Amino acid sequence: MKVLVTALIISFSTAVLTVPVSIITAPLSVETIPGSSLDSTKVLGKLEAAYAQYGADSTSFKNSLQNIINAYMSIAADYEAQAGILEVRADIAEAAKNDVLATELEIKGDALEALAEGYTKTAEMLQEFLKLISEHEHKLSVVFREVKSGMIGTAAMESRLRPQATSSLPATGGQPSTGGKPTTGGQPTTGGQPSTGGQPSTGGQPTTGGQSITGGQPTTGGQPTTGGLPTTGGQPSTGGQPTTGGQPTTGGQPSTGGQPSTGGHQQLGVNQPEETPAPNRQLKMFRHYSKVCWQI
């Protein structure tokens, strides 16, 4: 409380408290002025007494504070009136060519005006403080706590008492914008929960790890051509019987361009293709087949 009230009057007390007491106690009815300076200890004493007496009773405390404000405004008015009287007397002394007296009266008048201004501004600051209490009666305990903790100035007080603006949720990283559920098969919503664990967006079941295309049934041609009867690579049966009655080459290319086999045995049950013979081997085989055909 002391810190608050000191802050309320500190901007005025410097000028007021430096007024020479001799000027205030000089003749010309100055002695009738209630008080000789802005006594900050009186301000503190009044507020502390009110706080100690009423505590958190906001109505009683506000009434006591208002009485202090009224008293200070009354004192300020008295000082202002006395300053006006001194100003008139200074003008009379100046007209009478009494420059020394005129100067003295002007100095006394300025001092009284400073006192009046000090009490007025102190009362205004207390009135602002009372306004804050009236606007935030439900937070009166906060006001007293801030005062005791050393918070000074009504502007700082008001910032503490003013309701804080409701903070909105952050645009990113907060709650998801739509339902918070993952989007099935789609991309995750920005700022929401990722769609990990949902169904993939293409193909339903993943192609990798499911049924393998490679090694399964071929997509064209029915049965695979590999492993069937070869259409090429075997030696044509030159000069023998036609290759009729053998296994058909299902799914393979037709055997075209081979020489008809006349006079030979049917080539039945050929299972695997032979390697293409080397030239020397072809010559030996040709001679062998020629001898066989000659013997027949």
Curated annotation (Swiss-Prot):
Chain intervals for the UniProt region annotation (Disordered): 157-280
GO cellular component: extracellular region
Protein's cellular compartments: Secreted
Signal peptide annotation: 1-18
Secreted is among the record's keywords: yes
Keyword Phosphoprotein recorded: no
Name of the protein in question: Glycine and tyrosine-rich protein
UniProt feature, compositional bias: Low complexity: 172-264
Tissue: Component of the acid-insoluble and acid-soluble organic matrix of calcified layers of the shell (at protein level).
Keywords: Secreted, Signal
Organism annotation: Lottia gigantea
